[in-house]
Amino acid sequence: MSQLVECVPNFSEGNNQEVIDAISRAISQTPGCVLLDVDAGPSTNRTVYTFVGQPECVVEGALHAARTASQLIDMSKHKGEHPRMGALDVCPFIPVRGVSMEECVLCAKAFGQRLAEELNVPVYLYGEAAQTPSRQTLPAIRAGEYEALPEKLKQAEWVPDFGPSSFVPSWGATVTGARKFLIAFNINLLSTKEQAHRIALNLREQGRGKDQPGRLKKVQGIGWYLEEKNLAQVSTNLLDFEVTALHTVFEEARREAQELNLPVVGSQLVGLVPLKALLDAAAFYCDKEKLFVLEEEHRIRLVVNRLGLDSLAPFDPKERIIEYLVPDSGPEQSLLDTSLRGFVREVGARSAAPGGGSVAAAVAALGAALASMVGQMTYGRRQFDHLDSTMRRLIPPFHAASAQLTSLVDADARAFAACLEAIKLPKNTPEERDRRACALQEGLRQAVAVPLKLAETVSQLWPALQELAHCGNLSCLSDLQVAAKALETGVFGAYFNVLINLKDMTDDVFKEKTHHRISSLLQEAKTQAALVLGSLEARKE
């Protein structure tokens, strides 16, 4: 899995297109950096850039952007709706893939130190990189904004983490750090700025102060007026969308607005958003409205509609969801990106991978997909109206399992590659032999874990498949028969892939426990597949 860090620098310029473009070029021309999004706000006079790359690359990209900004932005002349204290106001580093939070903290520290040394400006650390509890949140550091800096920098409490304690009028100060994925989410209101701010105070965790906290944890908020759209916004930052979800903020803001008799007219996502945040919202609305929506594309479309994400500008998921913009290509091409003909050709080639493990995963995925198909060929037809609620319950497990099992096609090939890499390690000294042995054992654990997961996933499907066999559309009888044998065959393949990798493992307790588990899963698959086939034969008669 390739390492990927996201960097989201916020520069205090949202009107001068030449400056905005110059900073964009500085980032995109940095080797290893991919500029994903540039979101300029005229009223806020601020532009949010989003780019990704490996850790060392994003640090360089942020520095290149800062150098450019230092020549083009003069904070002494800056005015805008958004709180700010510097030309490069804030520059967070966020783990996206294959990177720990600790590694992002190192990115922030390296960037902060180099920025301070090169430009001779004050730099503060916040979030996970904060050196003191009082500097963990951005609003705490930014209190008083740019205008308060001359006096603030004289206070011992606010000595910068890097750089001088002197005021630099053209620059101000910069805050950098590491954090989880922050979602900038604004709810649109036909109201005054003051009414929007009143709602923000009720919602944000900080509330109106220590004695009057707000309702939503890990949420920052402010109300402002968006002149270019002629409406107000409750502007929020979701610091952890798994603590307070996107839809929770929207629904709570709408409830507050209703109490004030104010219309909510959609919302706006600034920058990029993780796929999970939208899928969580889709799950909420599907549950709330008792909707049956399976496909990821449709679930995202539902969320765009319910939140009104396209109310101010078109919302293109391919350009706004980070996983869609930066797929995990890794060093090898995904088997899932090849055609069926190409996959079969690769299996038949003179190479050990893809092998039986990948084929078992593909067969099981097809079995789950067939069961999903039978459910959908039953659902929504007038003669099966009485089965509507049953199909709504039975189809989703097969739909989800087919995606999970499909991902194991690649996972098995990667696990095999990890074992091969371990075998190739040098073994000339005792230390090298120990390192090689540890790497090989870890590789074997991965090679066991993938087929075991396959068998466990299929195990969860048997009850639903039994029920589907009793009531599914009989026109699809042969499809269900193939589904049952495909799922059984997938577990059959998983069983032998587990066994062949277990034999070289040294942990006897793990070997015995795993052998017992995979054996029971294989026996279950044989029994359950036979029962499904028997039920189908009985219905045919």
Swiss-Prot record:
Q: Which GO terms describe its biological process?
A: cytoskeleton organization; L-histidine catabolic process; L-histidine catabolic process to glutamate and formamide; L-histidine catabolic process to glutamate and formate; tetrahydrofolate interconversion
Q: Where is the active site?
A: 82, 412
Cite the residue spans of the region called Linker: 327-334
Please report a single Pfam family linked to this protein: FTCD
Q: Which SUPFAM superfamilies match?
A: Formiminotransferase domain of formiminotransferase-cyclodeaminase, Methenyltetrahydrofolate cyclohydrolase-like
Q: Is Cytoplasm among this UniProt entry's keywords? A: yes
The alphabetized UniProt keywords are:
Cytoplasm, Cytoskeleton, Folate-binding, Golgi apparatus, Histidine metabolism, Lyase, Multifunctional enzyme, Phosphoprotein, Transferase
Q: Under what name is this protein listed?
A: Formimidoyltransferase-cyclodeaminase
Function recorded in the entry: Folate-dependent enzyme, that displays both transferase and deaminase activity. Serves to channel one-carbon units from formiminoglutamate to the folate pool.
Pathway annotation from the record: Amino-acid degradation; L-histidine degradation into L-glutamate; L-glutamate from N-formimidoyl-L-glutamate (transferase route): step 1/1; One-carbon metabolism; tetrahydrofolate interconversion
Q: Where in the cell is it found?
A: Cytoplasm, Cytoskeleton, Microtubule organizing center, Centrosome, Centriole; Golgi apparatus
- Give the start-end ranges of region Cyclodeaminase/cyclohydrolase: 335-541
Q: Where is this region: Formiminotransferase N-subdomain?
A: 1-181
Q: Where does folate bind?
A: 163-172
Source organism: Mus musculus
On assembly, the entry states: Homooctamer, including four polyglutamate binding sites. The subunits are arranged as a tetramer of dimers, and form a planar ring-shaped structure.
Q: Which gene encodes it?
A: Ftcd
Q: Which GO terms describe its molecular function?
A: folic acid binding; formimidoyltetrahydrofolate cyclodeaminase activity; glutamate formimidoyltransferase activity; microtubule binding
Q: What is its EC number?
A: 2.1.2.5, 4.3.1.4
UniProt catalytic activity? 5-formimidoyltetrahydrofolate + L-glutamate = N-formimidoyl-L-glutamate + (6S)-5,6,7,8-tetrahydrofolate; (6S)-5-formyl-5,6,7,8-tetrahydrofolate + L-glutamate = N-formyl-L-glutamate + (6S)-5,6,7,8-tetrahydrofolate + H(+); 5-formimidoyltetrahydrofolate + 2 H(+) = (6R)-5,10-methenyltetrahydrofolate + NH4(+)
- Family stated for the protein in its record: In the C-terminal section; belongs to the cyclodeaminase/cyclohydrolase family.
Q: Which NCBIfam families match?
A: FtcD
The major lineage groups are: Eukaryota, Metazoa, Chordata, Craniata, Vertebrata
Q: Which residues carry this modification: Phosphoserine?
A: 520
| Region (Formiminotransferase C-subdomain), start-end ranges | 182-326
Q: Name one GO cellular component term.
A: Golgi apparatus
